[in-house]
From Swiss-Prot:
<dbReference type="InterPro" id="IPR036047">
    <property type="entry name" value="F-box-like_dom_sf"/>
</dbReference>
<dbReference type="Pfam" id="PF08268">
    <property type="entry name" value="FBA_3"/>
</dbReference>
<feature type="domain" description="F-box">
    <location>
        <begin position="20"/>
        <end position="69"/>
    </location>
</feature>
<feature type="region of interest" description="Disordered">
    <location>
        <begin position="1"/>
        <end position="24"/>
    </location>
</feature>
<dbReference type="InterPro" id="IPR013187">
    <property type="entry name" value="F-box-assoc_dom_typ3"/>
</dbReference>
<dbReference type="Pfam" id="PF00646">
    <property type="entry name" value="F-box"/>
</dbReference>
<dbReference type="InterPro" id="IPR001810">
    <property type="entry name" value="F-box_dom"/>
</dbReference>
<protein>
    <recommendedName>
        <fullName>Putative F-box protein At1g47765</fullName>
    </recommendedName>
</protein>
<dbReference type="InterPro" id="IPR017451">
    <property type="entry name" value="F-box-assoc_interact_dom"/>
</dbReference>
<feature type="compositionally biased region" description="Basic residues">
    <location>
        <begin position="1"/>
        <end position="19"/>
    </location>
</feature>
Length: 385
């Protein structure tokens, strides 16, 4: 009997060695390709399977490739109520609009900062007074970065991404204070966080946090030149960490920058007033060349309140413009406008408002501290821990 047990143990042990050898003999590129086809939650769970899988799924190349292959981007809607952050992920494309997936988390840190943010490649960056914070909604992780400069009483933060080297960088400027330097931090292991000083060579100040956008490795934001007080578009190359400056048209919303057909665009002030979306599109940064485009959008025929209570948040990869109100008190839906088909569609906020009512004494339209929407959000495998 004892000999049979020993023989059985040897067979089992041999079987395990065979399986282990078979698994380890699988080519790395094939293993990576299989993992890339899995959903984000499955990848997170499979990291504990082996050190090899952990190494593959945390490699920057894998993370960048996963993000480019992610399903269609979503509209991330956030609002704060009673110190809680509510997050809802809404598919932007038409066929899945009714099937929104929701997740909720809470943090005391969000109470004063949600209006002041930057987003890029699955990560969101914002700040509380002097402290920059980076948030990965997909992994429900956030990390507080070191204070850039003690002498800066308040700051503005921008998040940039270099697609060539696959690096995220946080850049920081003093809020409403002219400066010819900025602080830059490259995201990586938490123990290696450190700011470096970068000369801008253009003394300027900016207080329009929401105007920042990163396109093809360049961070754009609106600022005012120190000596002339002229409004300009500042450009920060994430990879080389060099600055440039472009002249701006006068009659634009200085708090709004959008991405339109892969280019940076400003929004003129006559937008919505004349049933047009009026854009100034940057064609050539080196030559300060801009083009104008008027897109007919009959807001008044759809809802007269659009002229007053809605703000253009941007243009999706599919070419739809998205308009969002700053509070549930004024509007109860998010508006999608297709400029090609000249059609409007709306996503009702009723379900989100119902969730709010549970924490607001049954009133679904009570006061909300902040309401924000992030376009073209994709899941990110980057760990902040």
């Amino acid at each position: 009997m004892e000999q049979q047990k020993q023989k059985k143990r040897k067979v089992v042990s041999k079987s395990k060695r065979t399986q282990s050898k078979s698994a380890s003999s699988l080519p790395l590129d094939l293993t990576s390709e299989i993992l890339l086809r899995l959903p984000e939650k499955s990848i997170a769970r499979f990291r504990c399977v082996s050190k090899l899988w952990l190494s593959i799924t945390t490699d920057p190349y894998f993370i960048n490739l996963f993000e480019t292959r992610s399903p269609r981007p979503s509209l991330l809607v956030c609002f704060i109520e009673n110190d809680k952050l509510f997050v809802s992920s809404i598919p932007q494309h038409l066929h899945s609009l009714q099937n929104s997936k929701r997740s909720y988390s809470s943090s005391q840190l969000f109470i004063v900062i949600i209006w002041n943010y930057q987003k890029d490649v699955g990560l969101i960056c914002f700040k509380t007074s002097k402290m920059p914070i980076v948030w990965n909604p997909s992994k429900r992780q956030l990390i507080t970065l070191p204070i850039p400069r003690l002498s800066w009483n308040n700051i503005i933060v921008f998040l940039g991404y270099d697609p060539v080297e696959g690096k995220h960088k946080v850049m920081c400027l003093p809020f409403r204070r002219s400066s010819d330097v900025c602080q830059v931090l490259t995201l990586g292991p938490a123990q290696e966080f450190s700011w470096i000083t970068v000369k801008t060579y253009h003394k300027h100040c900016s207080d329009y946090q929401s105007s920042g956008r990163c396109i093809k490795g360049v961070v754009y934001y609106i600022a005012q030149v120190y000596h002339t007080h002229a409004w300009v578009l500042m450009c920060f190359d994430v990879r080389s960490e060099k600055f440039d400056m472009i002249k701006l048209h006068a009659d634009i919303y200085r708090e709004i920058l959008i991405t339109y057909e892969g280019r940076i665009a400003c929004v003129e002030k006559r937008t919505t007033k004349d049933d047009y979306i009026a854009l100034c599109i940057l064609e050539d940064a080196k030559k300060d060349k801009w083009s104008s485009k008027d897109i007919l959008a009959p807001f008044g025929h759809f809802d007269e309140r659009l002229r007053t209570f809605f703000q253009l948040k941007g243009c999706t990869h599919d070419g739809e413009f998205i308009f969002v109100s700053s509070t549930f008190r004024k509007m109860d839906y998010i508006l999608f406008f297709d400029p090609v088909k000249k059609t409007f569609r709306r996503f009702e906020l009723k379900e989100i408002a119902d969730d709010q009512a549970r924490v607001n004494n049954g009133d679904p339209y009570g006061p909300i501290f902040a309401f924000c929407a992030f376009l073209d959000h994709v899941e990110s495998q980057m760990s902040l821990q």
